[in-house]
Design a protein with these regions (language model features):
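Short acidic active-site motifs
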Residues: 110-114
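Short glycine-/polar-rich loops that comprise or flank the Walker A/P-loop
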Residues: 72, 122-123
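TRNA-recognition modules of translation machinery and tRNA-sensing kinases, especially anticodon-binding
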Residues: 1-99, 104-106, 131-179
């Protein structure tokens, strides 16, 4: 990870400090305040806060961001083109409940798609094949525990509960992203 930005420019001002928020972050070269007490209110330096979470995540095996901070919370991967539509339905159902989900519809093998989700630190990866399409029981890779589980969409929603967002700004299909 790069060195801490010594002059964070994004600040959130609040009267009530969220519980458990770190006060500062220190790497091998610098220590930067995350929270400044301004007497009656607090300034939270967002750049330093995000750096803190990246630094902490990089210490984990596998590395993982808090679910609320992950750009993509759930990646849905069809095992072949026949299941892209089912994958889209699952991702749209997750988005409708306020979660950041996308579909890896690239013309690549399953292994590459799973590896891509891993390099992007996606917390939950849903694999959709014939069995999942027929039974509705999803195969879900849970990054934090490095395990694969079978669960319904409702059970996945229960795992995600409390991490809803207002809108996903990420295109539904990976193939629709630029670059």
């Amino acid at each position: 990870l790069p060195c801490i930005n010594e002059d964070p420019t994004i600040v959130v001002r609040t009267k009530v400090l969220p519980e458990g928020l770190p006060k500062s972050v220190k790497d091998s070269k610098n220590e930067v305040e995350i929270v400044e007490d301004k007497g009656g209110f607090y300034d939270i330096h967002v750049n330093a806060l995000i750096y803190y979470y990246l630094l902490e995540a990089s210490k984990l095996n596998p590395p993982i961001l808090p679910l609320w901070l992950s750009p993509v919370q759930v990646r849905v991967i069809p095992v072949k083109d026949d299941f892209v539509q089912k994958a889209i339905e699952i991702a749209e159902a997750l988005r409708a409940k306020g979660y950041r989900a996308d579909v890896d519809d690239m013309k690549e093998g399953l292994g590459k798609k799973i590896a891509r989700a891993g390099t992007e630190w996606v917390p939950f990866t849903v694999i959709v094949g014939e069995r999942e399409a027929q039974t509705g029981v999803l195969t879900v890779k849970v990054r934090e525990r490095n395990e694969q589980r079978q669960m319904s969409l409702e059970e996945l929603l229960e795992l995600l509960k409390g991490n809803e967002t207002s809108v996903s700004l990420i295109p539904l299909r990976i193939s629709e992203r630029s670059g």
